[in-house]
Amino acid sequence: EGRIFLSGNQAVALGKILGGCRVQTYYPITPAADESEYIEAHEIIKTTTDGGQGAVIVLQTEDEIAAVNMASGATLTGARAATSTSGPGFSLMVEGLSWAGNNEVPVVITYYQRGAPSTGLPTRHGQDDLRFAVHAGHGEFARIVLASGDLEECYYDAATAFNYAERFQVPVIHLV
């Protein structure tokens, strides 16, 4: 009664839509790609903006570096924008994250954690990446790291990430 069944990726995708995400970039990587593919496959989910209809633009990029930089660029135009990745992809995004942090760009990065080092175990999840998210980047800059504990938190944190990013003008990393 009053409940729906969702995967974690679907909960994050719907949370991003609730949070006003208008641009979602990604490079296919397990397990993060399912989120963007869910948004893309469900274009029936329309969002109202200023009395008109709108939707989320989903862009599959050539690599993770382009994904984070495209999301930052979209944010600079005034759109609420995000990207999603997992461990190895986040490693490639660090320079773009540093640039966003230095320039106070309110971009959201959804970081799907994997267990184990390197490419990890794509089908097993853990919190091995928390420290990396907190300290990633060249030099010091402000950032917010949200670490969701369950599907409900994934949903609400995905929406809240955009509010924090916009209010404090910093990158937000959402760990799931």
What are these regions (language model features)?
Residues 1, 143-176:
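Structural signature of the thiamine diphosphate
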Residues 1-136, 141-143, 147-148:
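Thiamine diphosphate
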